[in-house]
Amino acid sequence: MNAFMNPALQGAGRITGVFFHPAGDIVAVASAFPLLINPPARAAYGGAALRYRVGLYRRGDPAPFAACDASRLPVNDLAFHPDQPVIAIGGGSYDGGYMFEGELIAWNWDSGACHRPFLNVPEVVRCRYLEDGRIQAWVRPWDESWDEQDDDAPAAFETLLCVETAAGVATPELDPATATLDRATPPDADDAARRLADWLGLPDLGLRGAIWDLAWLDADTLAAVHDNCLLDRYRVDGALLARHDGGGRGAEILPTTPLVVHAIAPPDPAARFRRDSRLYALRDGELTTVREEDGQYTFCASADGRLLGRRDRVDARRRAAGDVLLDATLAEARRLDLGHYDCFNHYIGINGAPDLFALQGTPPDSHEGKHLCRVHADGRIERLWPLLKPDGTPASHAMECRGAYIDDALGAGVVIAGKHYSPTVGNKYRGFIYRKSLARGQERWRHATPASASAIVVADGLVLAAFLDGTLMLIDAASGDLLLASRVRIGGIATVLYALAAHGGRLAVGTLDGRIALVNLATLRTLRATRGGIDLA
């Protein structure tokens, strides 16, 4: 494998805290990874496994030698055990409505074992080890009712209470006598990043967030989009050919000629949650604006260069028809009403097919009873077949879908992955991936999936699908044989693939921690999963 375009600091997301070991030889870096909300009119969370990480680094080495991905909530504080290779990780946050959710983890970085001293605990703001090896933590009250009976009590958001771990105690008792005001100021993440870079001997950490999309421009050139630019162009040896900056950030790369980048415009100061869309074309090495659309869109492209844009109608001010069909010149636009669209229910993402495709509910203003539809060049909508058998159960409602076009000896078809809806909380994730013929919806093969799909590509007789729990699936496109289904690691550290692009027997992958790697498809076929998954390095 040829891995390249790594951030200078590897294996980290957005840094939220930096904690140096008292001996000065190790640093723990707490970071957060983004959910798959890209572009803003597409969202998928099902089965997502990696949100927060504590990575350990040695001086002078920008790659982590160990990482803990067990945290389910933001990491607020860390403490090193005085004698053992163990770290106490305190985390939590306000749930936005009433509760202060928290967790406390003791992680052994040598063995990888994690222990939660408390089954239930409110948000842990600070923690430290006592001399006897127990953990002392300062936590928020359980909820906002803390100060309801006492007008003189400080607000729950300003209060910390002291608890200590003890054998057999699953839920700590909060003693009001230990209450103290939280006078700490929020940590300066930028300052922490600068101190970390200095400690590692790096001019800059080079973090850029997730790689949202990839595309091959030719056999020797790869394009990528992430939060720090509109588009990057790389040579296959990893050399940066060009970085295209401008208003906003790149979200999707549409495989047309010329290449089109769907970008998200900068936030409007008057409406900070507004995310309008812009289209840029790459011509003669320059990225130029060709179109702006009011609202949150997703776009897909046909083989002949037509684009279909679907606008999220979650905004009550934009419930009217906002879908748009663009010809190959991107100059002529036809306004369409394909029915209701929301970010969890109607994204499909099929590119490079002779036709354009969309999902439509039954009736069209619904998110239920979804059908795959062909959108013709004149704007006519042809309903093809239901995504799932309409048996009246909640599981027949498909969500968080992703698709790809395929045309081989079996004929034209589509591969679609998605999630079976469940109306109850806490059920195990149930997902699917199948191949169906385009004409009649005949199912060729099907597999259960562990999480929602982030990306799917078809190449060299293979279907390659990446999932939000970090799994990569290789499926024989014709027979449906499952050749590989394994979690992915790079250099021993777990990751999640958000972007895939294949060309000339090579697969480019983009990760949620900002890395891009190349692997030969022939090599990928031969990999066998170990207990820790497959390592692309």
Where does each model-flagged region fall?
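A short beta-strand motif characteristic of beta-propeller blades
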Residues: 2-9, 63-68, 113-118, 198-205, ...
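Beta-strand-rich domains and repeat architectures in extracellular enzymes and scaffolds
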Residues: 7-43, 49, 205-222
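Repeated scaffold domains used in trafficking and secretory/extracellular systems
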Residues: 13-19, 72-79, 120-128, 209-213, ...
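Hydrophobic beta-strand positions that form the internal "hydrophobic ladder"
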Residues: 27, 87, 135-136, 222, ...
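Residue-level signature of beta-propeller blades and closely related beta-rich strand-turn architectures
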Residues: 32-34, 92-94, 141-142, 228, ...
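Short, solvent-exposed loop/turn segments at conserved positions within beta-propeller repeat blades
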Residues: 36-51, 95-102, 145-157, 269-275, ...
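Short loop/turn segments that connect beta-strands within beta-propeller blades
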Residues: 58-61, 108-112, 165-166, 235-239, ...
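Blade-level signature of beta-propeller repeat domains, shared across WD40, Kelch, NHL, RCC1
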Residues: 149-166, 494-537
